[in-house]
From Swiss-Prot:
Residues 53-73 form a coiled coil. The lineage of its organism: Bacteria, Pseudomonadati, Pseudomonadota, Alphaproteobacteria, Hyphomicrobiales. Residues 1-24 are annotated as: Disordered. It comes from Beijerinckia indica subsp. indica (strain ATCC 9039 / DSM 1715 / NCIMB 8712). The gene is greA. This is Transcription elongation factor GreA. Necessary for efficient RNA polymerase transcription elongation past template-encoded arresting sites. The arresting sites in DNA have the property of trapping a certain fraction of elongating RNA polymerases that pass through, resulting in locked ternary complexes. Cleavage of the nascent transcript by cleavage factors such as GreA or GreB allows the resumption of elongation from the new 3'terminus. GreA releases sequences of 2 to 3 nucleotides. GO terms for biological process: DNA-templated transcription elongation; regulation of DNA-templated transcription elongation.
Amino acid sequence: MDKFPMTPEGYHALDEELKRRQQEERPRIIQAIAEARSHGDLSENAEYHAAKEAQSLNEGRIAELEDKLSRAEIIDVSKLSGNTVMFGATVTLVDEDTEEEKIYQIVGESEADVKAGRVSITSPTARALIGKKIGDSVEVNTPGGGKSYEILNVAFQ
């Protein structure tokens, strides 16, 4: 059974989503199913079928969240240190071609948000960076082609 590394913030966000789905969405959907059922013939009842589909999607997501949370390996990034890139590190890179700086934090899969500078530990960027140190050059294979970066800084915050 694989563990999912995640930050305490990532765990909290998934836990909040699980609670919302269990305590708000589930009762709302059950009520919608009951109301649609009261309209009679279920074979041609679009409201009923839509509510049942919503129930299926919600219950599937609940099961997925419960699984991820049960297998979460919470890593408190503030207790990490060093100059080697690992899970939780905030890495400052410079594109060796354009001199453009980028800052990424390496987080768990469910926490990733590239626009917010949070890349999944399983992403090509993170896989290329893991184990590298300040001053190292890395080649990252992106969908747009290969990129060369130099690591300027590694921080844990």
